[in-house]
């Protein structure tokens, strides 16, 4: 996967490769806005030991100075404020099976299996620094999951649930077609 920063000067990529018959992952940060000191424009490389041997299936710039990597073992947030040296800000391990991910400029969200209690799913929202905004369980058969402004949307073909950033359900309704 790859993601271009909003101003188009930075690129983050996730590469999968084989090493002695074992599939591994590396994350590479490029900056095309800097001088030609490094003709490859590589400003940072993170190997599997930095990511706990996780496979990074999705990488995204949230804004000019924040990026997120979604792995099969959780997510990791990076700061690119120092253009020549991206740094890991926070690694958030997730033990449960990750069902869905979403991201916006200010927030990152995950839906996971809920292993405690009666509801089958857990909704976890984080800010771009990796702080938990809210974490709640739910029982709703969704097909889509988005963050729009200060709202979290879960929806399917015939209904929708909307939560605010305190985790309060603001809307729960069906559509008549």
List where the protein language model places each region:
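Surface-exposed loop/turn elements that mediate protein-protein interactions on large endomembrane-trafficking
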Residues: 1, 25-50, 72-94, 117-138, ...
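Repeated scaffold domains used in trafficking and secretory/extracellular systems
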Residues: 1-6, 44-64, 92-106, 138-150, ...
């Amino acid at each position: 996967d790859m993601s271009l920063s909003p101003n188009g000067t930075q690129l983050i990529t996730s590469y999968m490769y084989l090493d002695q018959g074992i599939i591994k992952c590396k994350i590479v940060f490029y900056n095309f806005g800097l001088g030609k000191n490094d003709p490859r424009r590589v400003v940072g490389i993170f190997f599997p030991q930095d990511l706990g041997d996780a496979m990074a299936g999705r990488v995204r710039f949230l804004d000019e100075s924040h990026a997120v990597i979604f792995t099969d073992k959780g997510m990791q947030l990076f700061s690119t404020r120092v253009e020549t040296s991206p740094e890991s800000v926070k690694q958030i391990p997730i033990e449960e099976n990750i069902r869905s991910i979403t991201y916006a400029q200010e927030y990152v969200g995950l839906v996971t299996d809920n292993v405690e209690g009666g509801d089958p799913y857990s909704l976890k929202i984080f800010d771009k620094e990796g702080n938990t905004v809210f974490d709640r369980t739910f029982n709703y058969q969704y097909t889509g999951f988005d963050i729009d402004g200060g709202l979290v949307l879960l929806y399917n073909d015939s209904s929708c649930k909307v939560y605010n950033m305190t985790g309060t359900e603001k809307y729960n309704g069906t559509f008549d077609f």
